[in-house]
Amino acid sequence: MYNRSIQIIAVIVLIFAFAIPGAAQTDTAKGPVYGWTHSVIGTLTATQVAFTDWAQGGENALAWGLALDGKSTLDQPHTNWANSYKFGFGQTRLGDQGIRKTDDRFDLESMLTYKMSEHWNPYAAATLKTQFAPGYKYPSTGPEVRVSQFFDPAFMTQSAGVVYQPVAEFKTRFGLGLREVLSSKFGYADDPETATEIEHSSINGGLESVSELTLKLDEQVSFSSKLELFSTFKHIDQVIMRSDNTIAAKVSKYITVMLNVQLLNERAVSPRTQIKETLAMGLSYTFL
């Protein structure tokens, strides 16, 4: 499992390595524009299928998803304060199964950078990841089992270090950080080494690395990728990896096709690498 995680990380790093030279060719002649800038993009997807006396068979189905992706940045001559927020929620109903959750995302990040040089600068950052609604597992026999809910679990980090940004499309940072996990009922913060008690919170110091790449592949096609790595001092050989990759193609002014692949490797939560893939077409609107 550890070797597989290293292979996944290596592939993502190679993507960054080949993409950066192309990004470096973009126009940098424009001068800086200071002040607040905001961007908010909302996406709505929906699918409905209904059968009446259909001889070939089939199941009635209804699925919907709502996503909001925003950024707010305050750029000043000596500092840059970047904030990002990603929210998503979706449900589906297939036949008589009832409504089930298919997407649930609550992701906040804030980073303050002090400008000391053109490419290398110190930073301080904080993140929060959780979900909106309860999550369930559905065994083949028996009732559904609740396995998560709002702020259970909640993952938070605070870090400080150095950020390197050679071009506008790519940046990577490395630093020291704290990582907290909160879990009141479902044991996500429990330490398996203490068998006699169940911890509801954990705090670990460690090393953080975050790399982000945003590319305009075509006039209507964009690619974004974010790789987050955290290794605690207690288990320095166990790298917690989160990878979020999206290709979006604008079919028309308000219709977008999007492919998103998320990878998560955290041995304390699951012994295997978790993979989530979403292919959706729906309405997309840029608010700001």
Sequence positions of predicted segments:
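Outer-membrane beta-barrel "beta-signal"
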Residues: 275-288
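Extracellular loop and loop/strand-boundary signature of outer-membrane beta-barrel proteins
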Residues: 52-58, 93-98, 141-148, 193-199, ...
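Membrane-embedded beta-strand positions of outer-membrane beta-barrel proteins
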Residues: 40-42, 83, 124, 160, ...
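Outer-membrane pore/translocation modules
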Residues: 99-206
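Transmembrane beta-strand segments of Gram-negative outer membrane beta-barrel proteins
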Residues: 32-48, 79-81
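Transmembrane beta-strands of outer-membrane beta-barrel pores
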Residues: 44-50, 76-78, 87-93, 128-134, ...
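Residue-level signature of outer-membrane beta-barrel architecture
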Residues: 70-74, 114, 164-166, 211-215, ...
